[in-house]
Amino acid sequence: MSSVKSGKSWIRQPIVVVLGHVDHGKTTLLDKIRGTAVAKKEPGEITQHVGASIVPASVLRKVAEPLKKYFPKLKIEIPGLLFVDTPGHELFSNLRRRGGSVADIAILVVDIMEGFQPQTWESIQILKERKVPFIVAANKIDRIPGWKPNHDQPFLETIRKQDPRIVSRLEELIYRLISQLYEAGFMAERFDRVKDFRTTVAIVPVSAKTGEGVPELLALLTGLVQRFMKKRLVTSEEPAKGVVLEVKEEPGLGTTIDVIIYDGVIRRGDTIVVGGKDKPIVTKVRALLMPRPLQDMRAHEGKFVSVEQVVAATGVKISAPDLDNALAGSPIFVVPSEDKIEEYIKIVKEEIESVRIKTDNIGVVVKADTLGTLEAVVEALKRENIPVRLADVGPVSKNDVLEASVSKNHRPEYGVIIAFNVKILPEAEEYAARENVKIFRHNVIYKLIEDYIGWVKQLREQEKIKELESLIRPGKIRILPGYIFRRSNPAIVGVEVIGGVIKPGYPLMRKDGMRLGTIMQIRDRDNVLKEARAGQSVAISIRGRILVGRHVDEGDILYTDIPKQHVHLWLTKYKNELSDDEKMVLKEIIEIKKKQDPFYGLVFGS
C-alpha cells in the first residue's frame, strides 16, 4: 500500500465511476480496464482496493504509448486512476458529498446500437445534479455488422482498417448519440474532433469485449483530469475525509464499512465519526484492511491484509466497534483531536438531516437502503413534481404506513410508499393491506418512479370515469304521440331521444324549466337499458309529481335537468368529453335555466 508521500501535499488519483443503462456493458468495460491494469502493471504494484481498482500511472503510460503519434503532448502526471468497482448509479448515489459527489469524473456507457435508454437519461440527470463531468463510451462497436475487430488497439488505429461503409454506419450511430446528448442539454462530438473539452462532451467509440478504443478512453480521462482538475486532486497529510460505500458483515470481523477516502490520511487507532441510523457514530479504527494480492491468497489467511495507514484516494475496509447502525452514503471523518469530536458530530448530523425528510405536508413516503439512494429517489420524485412527506433509510415500518394513510385521506395519489431496495416489515405489510396503502418496491430507481407514475395515471383515469359517471349529461327527448302507457305514479311513456343521452336516475324538466320527476327505468321492448342515445326510441318510467295530460302531453319536448355544479364541470374540466349533439343540447338547457338563475352556466375567469 502506498505510504504518505514526501512533503505535505500530493496529487491523488481521480475517482472514476461508470454509469449507464442495464446490459449496455458497464461491468464488461470495468473488467476490461481491470484486466489491462493487472496485465500491464509493474511487479509489486497493487491494483485492487476495497470496492475500487487502481490503474497505476505505469499502466497508463504503456496504454497511451501507441497514441503518442496522435497526441504528442500527452504526459502522465497523476499517480493513476481509481475506478469504483460497482457500476451503476445506485452505488454512485452513495458517493455523495455536500453539494456534489466524491466522484471526480464519470464514464457514461451507451450501447451504440441501442442509443439512449431510460437509465442513460437518468444517469445524465444524476451527473448533472451532482455536477460530475463525464465522457461517453459508445460501446459495442464490434456489434456493427461487418466490423473487423482488432483486439486492444486504439480506436484511431482500428477505424483505419474498416470498410468505408462500416465507417459511415459508425458515423450515423455517433450522430444519433450527439443528437440525444443535445436533447439532454449537452454539446457533444467524437473525442478526436472536440475543440474545447470544457464545453463539449467527448464520445469515445469502444468495444469492452475486444478492448478497441480503451486506450483512448483511459488517455482521455487522464488528460481531462490533469488539465481541468489538478486543484481538486491536491490532497495532504490532513485527517482523512471519505464516504461510506457499503456496510458489510465480515466473518470474524463483525460489521465493517467499505469506504472511499478522497482526502487526507487515515491511520489505525484514529477516532472517526460516521453517520448512523439514529445518530452519528464515534468510534476508533481497529483495523484498516486491503485485499490480499491474489498471488498471496492462502485459504487460511483470509481475504484481507491489515495496513497501518492509507492515503487518498483509496478504497479501504474499516473494522471498528459500534458500526452496526452505520449508513451507506454517509460521510466519514477522521477527528484531528478529542476536543473536535462535537464539531464533527454536528457536521455529520447536518449532512444526514439534509437528506432525510419529515414534514406535515401531503406527499409520498420514501424508504431506501442507503443515504445515497434515498437522496437519488427523492431527487427523481422532485423532477416529476411529486411531493414527499417523509424520506428515511431503513425497512418499511407500520409508522410509514400510518404517515402514508394521512396523505391518502387528503390526496389518494400521494397515499403510497416508495420503497427502494428495502424490506417491508410483516406488521407494516398487514397494516398496509388493511389501510389499502399501496407500496411500490423496486431496485431500479427509474422503474420505481415509472411504476408509480403509471399507477397515478390509472388512478386519475378511474377517478375521472367515476366523476363522469356521477355527472348528469345533457339529454333532449320528445314524447311520442300514441305512446302514453300510464299517466302517473309512475308515468310510462314512449319517447324519442333527439339529442344527447338519458339514463335511469336523471331528473327531467320541461321547456320552461319546471322539474317533472326522475327517470326510473328505460326499456326497449323486453330489454332494460342502462342508457338511450340520440336516434333511439324507448319507453321510460318517470317517478315524481307528474300527470300526463296536465303537466306534459304527447309531442312535448323534455330535457335532463342538470345541476349548476355539473354544468360548470361540463363547461370546464370535461368540455372535451361531450359529443357535438350533447354540446348543442347543453346550450339549450343553459338558455332555459338562465331565466331562473342568471349565473347558471357562467364560467368565471374564462
Curated annotation (Swiss-Prot):
Pfam families: GTP_EFTU, GTP_EFTU_D2, GTP_EFTU_D4, IF-2. GO terms for molecular function: GTP binding; GTPase activity; translation initiation factor activity. Residues 20-27 are annotated as: G1. Residues 11-230 form the tr-type G domain. InterPro entries: EFTu-like_2, EFTU-type, P-loop_NTPase, Small_GTP-bd, T_Tr_GTP-bd_dom, TF_aIF-2_arc, TIF_IF2, TIF_IF2_dom3. Residues 45-49 are annotated as: G2. GO terms for cellular component: cytoplasm. It comes from the Archaea. Residues 139-142 are annotated as: G4. Gene3D superfamilies: P-loop containing nucleotide triphosphate hydrolases, Translation factors, Translation initiation factor IF- 2, domain 3. Residues 85-88 are annotated as: G3. GTP binds at residues 20-27, 85-89, 139-142. Residues 207-209 are annotated as: G5. Keywords: GTP-binding, Initiation factor, Nucleotide-binding, Protein biosynthesis. Belongs to the TRAFAC class translation factor GTPase superfamily. Classic translation factor GTPase family. IF-2 subfamily. HAMAP family: IF_2_A. Function in general translation initiation by promoting the binding of the formylmethionine-tRNA to ribosomes. Seems to function along with eIF-2. This is Probable translation initiation factor IF-2. The lineage of its organism: Archaea, Thermoproteota, Thermoprotei, Desulfurococcales, Desulfurococcaceae.
